[in-house]
Amino acid sequence: MERWPWPSGGAWLLVAARALLQLLRSDLRLGRPLLAALALLAALDWLCQRLLPPPAALVVLAGAGWIALSRLARPPRLPVATRAVLITGCDTGFGKETAKKLDAMGFTVLATVLDLNSPGALELRDLCSPRLKLLQMDLTKAEDISRVLEITKAHTASTGLWGLVNNAGLNIVVADVELSPVATFRKCMEVNFFGALELTKGLLPLLRHSRGRIVTVGSPAGDMPYPCLAAYGTSKAAIALLMDTFGCELLPWGIKVSIIKPGCFKTDAVTNVNLWEKRKQLLLANIPRELLQAYGEDYIEHVHGQFLNSLRMALPDLSPVVDAIIDALLAAQPRSRYYPGRGLGLMYFIHHYLPEGLRRCFLQNFFINHLLPRALRPGQHGPAPA
């Protein structure tokens, strides 16, 4: 088959023109996704030149390039204008960084913190504009939630409340379910589920009026049975189902609901080794003697060490999560789910499509590779395996 010198040149000119236009409009970012798309287009060009006649190669490559750039384009966003957003859990991590970014964009930000004198609260007070208002709130205290609701209604009387970001979260134990006090399950549910539920319900009249947004930070641990994270994971599973229900029920009111499910990021709450050491010592002090003998203190130390080792993979750059929250607040058509982080696509593929035995093996090797409890080790007297 006779080939043209460069039959796809017109397609590449079309792709380049559109890419340049999107870059000038800030609808496209220079980065790995764009470079990967261009590499795939180059490979497709090579195949088309060898397998298709020139007109067909031109059409296929132009169509593929157009689709790729459409997928990479930022979705249309709403103007910030005078929009107000309430964010919980702004002492550290995602909440603090999101509050700073939204304030810089021109939002009116109401940022709740556990302690108005915490380092994070002081940082927000120093770095942000007078538009940002700090509010003290403990999600386990109904009186704190009621006070924040009243302040929010008064503070947004002229602008309305556009968005609620349920970011505050808590995990206080990394241990097998049998070793975890029931109180830790209740505590996680109080913060991660009931507190968010009460606050969200209280703000619905304002959000219905603005036809605004509800954005909640969940976790993959609410979708997959991570070993030793049952207390945290069950609370995140509960809040995800609640938000999905809100998404259905509030659709007629024009409220859009999104859940952010980040991978492992280096936030203070996650990577504070001294805090996890204190929690481990508290756990050891409260385990009944007979149960501790069955599992062994070395088993608990091993789990603790494996958990801390897994945190080495935590990503220091929190911007993917912050960007996902902002997109959920401002995109004309936000997604119902966002998965910022590295490797989540593979994890969810394994969870949904591979056999149960392989899923369990993957989670244990990826997160915590268990040591056998003392009573089950060879040479130890203990219960016979079932």
From Swiss-Prot:
Inhibited by glycyrrhetinic acid. Induced by progesterone, through the Ihh signaling pathway. NAD(+) binds at residues 82-111. The keyword Oxidoreductase applies. It is found in: Microsome; Endoplasmic reticulum. The active site is at Y232 (proton acceptor). GO terms for biological process: cortisol metabolic process; female pregnancy; regulation of blood volume by renal aldosterone; response to food; response to glucocorticoid; response to hypoxia; response to insulin; response to xenobiotic stimulus. InterPro entries: NAD(P)-bd_dom_sf, Sc_DH/Rdtase_CS, SDR_fam. It is an enzyme of class 1 (oxidoreductase). Highly expressed in kidney. Also found in colon and small intestine. Not expressed in the adrenal gland. Expressed in uterus. Keywords: Endoplasmic reticulum, Lipid metabolism, Microsome, NAD, Oxidoreductase, Steroid metabolism. It holds the Pfam family adh_short. One of its GO terms (molecular function) is NAD binding. Substrate binds at S219. GO terms for cellular component: endoplasmic reticulum. It comes from the Eukaryota. Its EC number is 1.1.1.-. PANTHER family: 11-BETA-HYDROXYSTEROID DEHYDROGENASE TYPE 2, SHORT-CHAIN DEHYDROGENASE/REDUCTASE FAMILY 9C. Interacts with ligand-free cytoplasmic NR3C2. Catalyzes the conversion of biologically active 11beta-hydroxyglucocorticoids (11beta-hydroxysteroid) such as corticosterone, to inactive 11-ketoglucocorticoids (11-oxosteroid) such as 11-dehydrocorticosterone, in the presence of NAD(+). Functions as a dehydrogenase (oxidase), thereby decreasing the concentration of active glucocorticoids, thus protecting the nonselective mineralocorticoid receptor from occupation by glucocorticoids. Plays an important role in maintaining glucocorticoids balance during preimplantation and protects the fetus from excessive maternal corticosterone exposure. Belongs to the short-chain dehydrogenases/reductases (SDR) family. This is 11-beta-hydroxysteroid dehydrogenase type 2. It comes from Mus musculus (Mouse). The gene is Hsd11b2.
